[in-house]
Amino acid sequence: MSIRIIPQDELGSSEKRTADMIPPLLFPRLKNVYNRRAERLRELAENNPLGDYLRFAALIAHAQEVVLYDHPLEMDLTARIKEANDQGKPPLDIHVLPRDKHWQKLLHSLIAELKPEMSGPALAVIENLEKASEQELEQMASALFASDFASVSSDKAPFIWAALSLYWAQMASLIPGKARAEYGEARQYCPVCGSMPVSSMVQISTTQGLRYLHCNLCETEWHVVRVKCSNCEQSRDLHYWSLENEQAAVKAESCGDCGTYLKILYQEKDPKVEAVADDLASLVLDARMEQEGFARSSINPFLFPGEGE
């Protein structure tokens, strides 16, 4: 089952009521996304072998919060949503939507915010990005969107992605439409931008017990039923792995049919779990899944494959 985004004026009253029952999409609410992520990363850094890198990621998340408010985005996406709906495409499709210079402005603002906090190799990386031409930055962005990770060094990718993600999240939060679930394929990709998830989460509150995949780019969440592979939609050979016990808040859901896995986080086990932070902090579980022969079906925005990986 795929999810299409229907323009507000094309939704009948019955569709509006149905959409309110089980929301197929949760558009990003940017008010506290980045601060909460930064706080969780810092918390998880304590007594974690990856503590230094988690604190580094927290600096980037905090910078995103600052830049978000320094550079708000105003854009009318009504026409874009209608066009994408007619074409059956995500409205902010990363492979189609032209990028304007706003994302590069965000990148340079992130660099300015981060430079006082960086030293050594990390400082050299952002200084190198600061000197890059607009064309070079666009080429790196296009390579990341095409999953051509060999063309962008893994130390530059998190900074480029942080700016792109902030830009796409700003756009996604402005979408003036509702979502309707329709039968189809490709539920493994974000219905808003076409990127992949970072992890999935079984939620509490108004969406109690429902699983949502969290986009690694635009921060949108979309509903996928539980006990079904989020990558191939099969359900006959699923297994759940953890490094702790059955009550663990972070598990990996593996599929024997397609040979992939995705992290699944449980808010009922730990209300503070965060899609990006807890995924990054549990890389030991990723190593275990690789040993078991499973490939990751997602990418964390702070950890990109390097050349040859």
Curated annotation (Swiss-Prot):
GO cellular component: cytosol
GO MF, any single term: ferric iron binding
Domain of life: Bacteria
Gene3D superfamilies: FdhE-like domain
Entries under InterPro entries matching the protein: FdhE-like_sf, FdhE_C, FdhE_central, FdhE_N, Formate_DH_accessory
GO biological processes: protein maturation
Key words, A-Z: Cytoplasm
Predominant location: cytoplasm
A Pfam match: FdhE_central
Compartments in which it is found: Cytoplasm
Family the entry assigns: Belongs to the FdhE family.
Function as written in the Swiss-Prot or TrEMBL entry: Necessary for formate dehydrogenase activity.
Name of this protein: Protein FdhE
Source taxonomy: Bacteria, Pseudomonadati, Pseudomonadota, Gammaproteobacteria, Enterobacterales
